[in-house]
A protein has these predicted regions:
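Hydrophobic faces of well-ordered beta-strands that scaffold small-molecule active sites
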Residues: 2-6, 22-26, 57-60, 98-100, ...
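Histidine-acidic metal/acid-base catalytic patches
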Residues: 10-20, 96, 144-159, 169-250
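N-terminal pre-domain/capping segments
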Residues: 1-85
């Protein structure tokens, strides 16, 4: 299943969804102001979903200033609160997946103990929950190893990984094919966009320096059941990327 991140206005998104038949990845509740007003904002957004004729939905959760592996108990509590609010919103809207960032920033956070603390957080967070797959996404993570450690330590079958190929290409020295090979058994969701490695531009596939001829067949072969979200804001980039995905059998 292909989804498109809600990075354009509703009118453009409605037309794009009609043209492609794709689902929507909601970013509305990645914003703390909306999480603080769920009772007010959820009904409004449900109406907007109907107006856009959204048929399938995933959700991107909050990430700014949050860190599930934080040593600071108050930061950890706020992270838990925001993730709980996003999970509740995902349930009410009928989203099947909730994408959450690791919060790890290379050369800011120490890698020692990070996997254990993150796994402890998600084991507690997911206790008693089912029906929504939580997908942990790489952003500034330098390589796949520690995220795989987290996946192996989290007990819930509703916990998986989200491979963002644009982030891996831009923010890691590990080649993309090594990310794909390592993540393959653990990935339920993929984010696609392109860049030239100098900045996380979220361009359409083919506009940056990702080797599509190598990466796309490898993704399709090694993660055949993973859903995919196009994370571009320019309508032209969205449609170009959609066509690339279809050309490679997604």
């Amino acid at each position: 299943m292909i989804y498109i991140s809600h990075l354009t206005d509703d009118a453009q998104m409605k037309n794009i969804l009609k043209e492609t038949g794709a689902g929507l990845e909601c970013i509305e509740f990645s914003v703390s102001d909306n999480l603080d007003r769920l009772d007010e904002r959820l009904p409004r957004f449900e109406k907007r979903l109907k107006e856009m004729n959204v048929s399938q939905l995933t959700m991107h959760g909050p990430f700014l200033d949050l860190n599930p592996a934080s040593y600071d108990s108050h930061v950890a509590k706020v992270t838990r609160l925001r993730f709980e609010q996003a999970y509740a919103a995902a349930g009410k809207l009928g989203a099947d997946k909730l994408v959450l960032h690791t919060g790890f920033i290379y050369r800011v956070h120490l890698p020692e103990g990070w996997a254990g603390r993150t796994a402890d957080f998600f084991n507690e967070f997911l206790e008693g929950k089912s029906g929504i797959t939580v997908c942990l996404e790489n952003v500034y993570d330098p390589g796949p190893r520690t995220m795989i450690e987290v996946k192996k330590r989290v007990q819930s079958s509703d916990f998986s990984l989200c491979l963002d190929i644009g982030h891996a290409h831009c923010n890691s020295d590990v080649p993309l094919d090594e990310w794909i090979e390592a993540f393959a058994p653990y990935t339920a969701h993929i984010h696609v966009h392109d860049n030239d490695k100098s900045w996380d531009y979220h361009q359409g596939l083919g506009k940056g320096t990702i080797d599509l001829g190598n990466v796309m067949p490898m993704l399709k072969a090694s993660m055949p059941d993973a859903s995919v979200t196009i994370e571009c804001s320019d309508p032209g980039d969205i449609l170009t990327t959609y066509r690339v995905l279809k050309d490679y059998g997604f």
